[in-house]
Amino acid sequence: MAISSSSCLGLICSLLCHWVGTASSLNLEDPNVCSHWESYSVTVQESYPHPFDQIYYTSCTDILNWFKCTRHRISYRTAYRHGEKTMYRRKSQCCPGFYESRDMCVPHCADKCVHGRCIAPNTCQCEPGWGGTNCSSACDGDHWGPHCSSRCQCKNRALCNPITGACHCAAGYRGWRCEDRCEQGTYGNDCHQRCQCQNGATCDHITGECRCSPGYTGAFCEDLCPPGKHGPHCEQRCPCQNGGVCHHVTGECSCPSGWMGTVCGQPCPEGRFGKNCSQECQCHNGGTCDAATGQCHCSPGYTGERCQDECPVGSYGVRCAEACRCVNGGKCYHVSGTCLCEAGFSGELCEARLCPEGLYGIKCDKRCPCHLDNTHSCHPMSGECGCKPGWSGLYCNETCSPGFYGEACQQICSCQNGADCDSVTGRCACAPGFKGTDCSTPCPLGRYGINCSSRCGCKNDAVCSPVDGSCICKAGWHGVDCSIRCPSGTWGFGCNLTCQCLNGGACNTLDGTCTCAPGWRGAKCEFPCQDGTYGLNCAERCDCSHADGCHPTTGHCRCLPGWSGVHCDSVCAEGRWGPNCSLPCYCKNGASCSPDDGICECAPGFRGTTCQRICSPGFYGHRCSQTCPQCVHSSGPCHHITGLCDCLPGFTGALCNEVCPSGRFGKNCAGVCTCTNNGTCNPIDRSCQCYPGWIGSDCSQPCPPAHWGPNCIHTCNCHNGAFCSAYDGECKCTPGWTGLYCTQRCPLGFYGKDCALICQCQNGADCDHISGQCTCRTGFMGRHCEQKCPAGTYGYGCRQICDCLNNSTCDHITGTCYCSPGWKGARCDQAGVIIVGNLNSLSRTSTALPADSYQIGAIAGIVVLVLVVLFLLALFIIYRHKQKRKESSMPAVTYTPAMRVINADYTIAETLPHSNGGNANSHYFTNPSYHTLSQCATSPHVNNRDRMTIAKSKNNQLFVNLKNVNPGKRGTLVDCTGTLPADWKQGGYLNELGAFGLDRSYMGKSLKDLGKNSEYNSSTCSLSSSENPYATIKDPPALLPKSSECGYVEMKSPARRDSPYAEINNSTPANRNVYEVEPTVSVVQGVFSNSGHVTQDPYDLPKNSHIPCHYDLLPVRDSSSSPKREDGGGSNSTSSNSTSSSSSSSE
């Protein structure tokens, strides 16, 4: 039983908590901690196998239930239940005589140790110079140490400490009693000084003088003997050769790598290397070893540190430096580079295709179904399409799915940011705004468009879109390139906000603040200047004497009745002065005379004696004392009277700091713009800045076809009829296409506009990516290819007429005839008793099973009964006698339908002629447990009513016994045993043979050719790589049909592996896929007469297989209800039937 993960987690948590709790109280590593174990219970969840009744179906002879029988078996599923588990935990406490102090257990003394410490229960350890049970008594002068129990015993003139008992030794001595010399390496008083002698030299224990070991010299023996010298005092000469180094002490030679001997005079023998040749070379496969380094120099075809590896695929020769040149799937021999071609190819480099271009098959009579423009090869045997890079599908008619490219669309695109990936090269076509090999780098500032090739034209610090170059203007600017200020009355981002300024106030295009015209004030310029003030910002004060204030803009005094003059200070009429206002004034430009002296008082904007001159440039107003404001876009200084600015064309406002309102242009904004289609009008010269996608003086003309963007300067990159947006160049794909530039077909299973429609095609049909129209596979028809060919037709488009006779059925794909009971042959036109399956004597051979004839013995009834009975009785006695001596047996085999095949190859079957005119039988079996191939022994007395009994054992293996073989029917049988080559698996045969276990170097050879090879003489070996539990049985050649024509079709979809019937054990369901189980072509008579024909759906899910030929059939299991033999072989028949019955019951 298993404990669930949640229970385990709870158990671990409880143990952890207990450990933490214990650890927090006592240190378990304390030697004074004692512990004991206590038990406790926890609830856990545990799993157990729960039995249940499982129903399944097997093939049987029950014709009423269509040959299906229900079976029951007991199976188990995992269930869970709660249970209690006893756990143990350790509990810790202080040992007796100890008590707990913090996390330690300390000893307890009843009497406190005064000058000592408690080291054990009721035991004190006194400090030196003290004694007594509680260390409270001091030692007398004759004793020392703990408890005053020791006497001084110092030697070598050492002094004894009466309290500590320590001896103060003389220089060069040590020890408790100073009886020992200083340890090696120390000397002097208390041996505290360390000797400085090196390299094993000895030191005088009193003075520290060094006495050097052999091989060293110097005051501290720190130097080795000079090169070429060794021994005591470095007086001896070294004899080493070949760069050998002499040991400075012994003079022994240390040889360099590759040399050996007393004086390093001998090179390493072969197979050895390294220092003193002590290491053994580890080079394999004929590699040689460098005597110095041990590095392997590999023989041609091998590599690796020890030459243990063959050259990687695609290389050969010395150091694997040569590149293989084999084409068309040919395998390159790693030593010489010789090409081992796949079936269907030949030539030194496998460059020659056996079939003409466009054809394939055994007879090169089938036309390749590949789309030629997208295909680089059509396999000459299987017809499999080898797609060019960028294409996939059965017929190379599908582009790579988005995100994949290259050979077989197996490589993953690295493109980022919505880039298109070239399905052939994988090169990235970046979306506008990105660049780089993988389109991961955004455009730098100032660049935009495809590959960032265009330069931004935005002005006034506007942000340029890296995609289409459109400008995102800062506040206060607008236009295609952000070169135009916001029109009068607008401000902010996009000039979308309306100014709130009144009375001619100018609006700041950035923040909307108002700059008031002269004479006005307030946040919105809604208030006139206060009484007594006038001018810009109401900063000037009125200079009037008898007036009702002054004009808020000009400061002109509004005189009270009876008063006149510039300052309203004269009682004379306008133009008079002096006594009784009798003198005329000569002042000009509205000036007044002083009533006293006639001096001219000039009106605002004028100056001079008679006020005939205007203010100097830059000044205006009363007495020309006011300074002109900063006119932004003006043709000159301000007006000498009002102070207003004279604006340039396109500008307006008191300070000429406002652009003409939208739709107006020119001097005083008097002109009307004519721009259309959202074009921006230049307020100065009326020119139009067109919106992307439009051109012309008034932006009324759209971009020409295949152009887009501002002024239509960019060229569209859309393909396959896609519509290109004139604004941003975006491609609007036509139905059936997708991708950034509409270069990719709809993914598999989709079609139509935006690839949004789901294909409805069935049975592996191709779906047109534009219209969704289905192109049916061979054997199907209908709008969605949902219908099989009508009865009597088959093939592509169901245009071919079946040629099957005698009520036989026709395969709707291949036209293969499925014969009615009692018939055989390619067209079911032969009355048959023997059914043979043969596809290829070398590639794949199906089992041929004998059957009883309904008519044998009919002619014998005409003969005189007495003579016939006597004759048959004699034959029967002879047969029984021979049969007892024969006792031939066959090894156990496991059948597979040999249909789960990839790239299977065909070779025309041949037979070996025998000396007596018969055919030599190459009868063989394949079995995972048997690698020995057995052939049947010759039997001179064989009844032509031969039978093959098939019984199923308890371990589900099939055992086959060939009995009563007729020499005339089956040819002379040779008793021999062939064994597989020793390197069958190790030499790579398993990978080279293909799905049928055939070395392709033997493809196309006859059995006669193979028979000449001594290694394979008298044996035919088969090694199946199929995953099915049935292997192939090759029957005697006499059972082969005269014609070897076989139905053949290429199906490449993968086989289903998840079906509960993917492997055959005890039954063959009615819906068995014909590509997983070979169809029963004809009903076997005699012992198999109740088997019947099983209706199957052979095209449930096709895969890359070869359709069986007309004579392929399943191994049929014997039934307990079958009739007994007609030849009187009762014992054999009974034995066979009983064996079959036991097999059935075992299920």
From Swiss-Prot:
The chain crosses the membrane at residues 858-878. Glycans are attached at residues 134, 496. CDD domains: EGF_Lam. InterPro entries: EGF-like_CS, EGF-like_dom, EGF_extracell, EGF_PEAR1L-like, EMI_domain, LE_dom, MEGF_diff_regulators. GO terms for biological process: apoptotic process involved in development; engulfment of apoptotic cell; homotypic cell-cell adhesion; muscle cell development; myoblast development; myoblast migration; positive regulation of cell-cell adhesion; positive regulation of myoblast proliferation. GO terms for molecular function: complement component C1q complex binding; Notch binding; scavenger receptor activity. It comes from the Eukaryota. It is found in: Cell membrane; Cell projection, Phagocytic cup. Expressed in cerebellum (at protein level). Expressed in kidney, stellate cells of the cerebellum and macrophage cell lines. The keyword Nuclease does not apply. Its main location: membrane. The keyword Nucleotidyltransferase does not apply. Gene3D superfamilies: Tie2 ligand-binding domain superfamily (2.170.300.10). Pfam families: EGF_2, EGF_laminin, EGF_PEAR1L, hEGF. Keywords: Cell adhesion, Cell membrane, Cell projection, Disulfide bond, EGF-like domain, Glycoprotein, Membrane, Myogenesis, Phagocytosis, Phosphoprotein, Repeat, Signal, Transmembrane, Transmembrane helix, Ubl conjugation. Homomer. Interacts with GULP1 and ABCA1. Interacts with AP2M1. Does not interact with MEGF11. Binds with high affinity to complement C1q. Interacts (via the cytoplasmic domain) with NOTCH1 (via NICD domain). This is Multiple epidermal growth factor-like domains protein 10. It comes from Mus musculus. The gene is Megf10.
